[in-house]
Amino acid sequence: VPRRRIGFAYRFAAVICKPPLVVLLKRDWRGMENIPAEGGFITAVNHNSHIDPFAYAHFQYNTGRVPRFLAKSGLFNKGFVGAMMRGTGQIPVYRESTDALSAFRAAIDAVERGECVAFYPEGTLTRDPDGWPMTGKTGAARVALQTRCPVVPVAQWGANEVLPPYAGRPRLFPRKTHRVLAGPPVDLDRFYGREMTPELLKEATEVIMAAITRHLEEIRGEKAPAVPYDPQRERVEQRRKTRVQAQTRRKGYGGRSVRGPAEHGPSERRQSAHGVPADGAQAGPQYQEGRHQERQNEQRRAGKRAAAREEGLNT
């Protein structure tokens, strides 16, 4: 692809970014032949480090087809960074506003102009504990079905070893290897010409994410979980646990019955710190013995007090 199509701003950004990337990361790049030489297309890439957009852009820059990333709109207002984002043709994503659909329209326009739009279908850094791709959002599938452009699934691994997701400090040494595998375009033919329902978009997205995950398995030499991490499912589960804990505390404060954890089974009961059954169940032998000992101690103390009073009266 002629350099004039890359543009001055992208070439200037490459001059700044490539030297530190070359120093930090060795390269194991495969599948460049699957990047289309002409025409608009989408790359769908997994996201596991704050620096992997730069590492991945380095890979695709070397193919001659530079990516246009969808990025948070706030980055476009940050001085030099914002100027570079605008100059290199990145696409702002406005969230929770009337402009939320503008990124979708801009992505379609870019593809129809013959450019590459790079999607991180997960929408954010993976939260999977082992770094596997999460469930994806439907933006890439929506643009692909609207334009019928090729979708190239890309897996990457290595930038996360320099700067793990949600980590505070980078791990610069020893030098890590950035591994990239770009696969052949995903076959989405069976989705064309059908009504673009949420169910259809979800199914197409699952096909794209499955292709990314297969390539990452090949890179890592490991098997991914059978069910991908689902942030929405985890949020629902966390809210459920929070509600249960809040209800348990309220019942405990009000003197009402408190059931133990469900996994203990209906026949088992949780006891308080003093050994009192929390749900009104029949007291066990340990609790009864403790109460008996307490009554005996109280009787001894009462006897001593009475003896002391009698001694005082007789003095």
Task: Name each region found by the language model.
Residues 268-315:
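Long, low-complexity, intrinsically disordered segments
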Residues 6-25, 82, 86:
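Short hydrophobic helices that act as membrane-entry/anchoring signals
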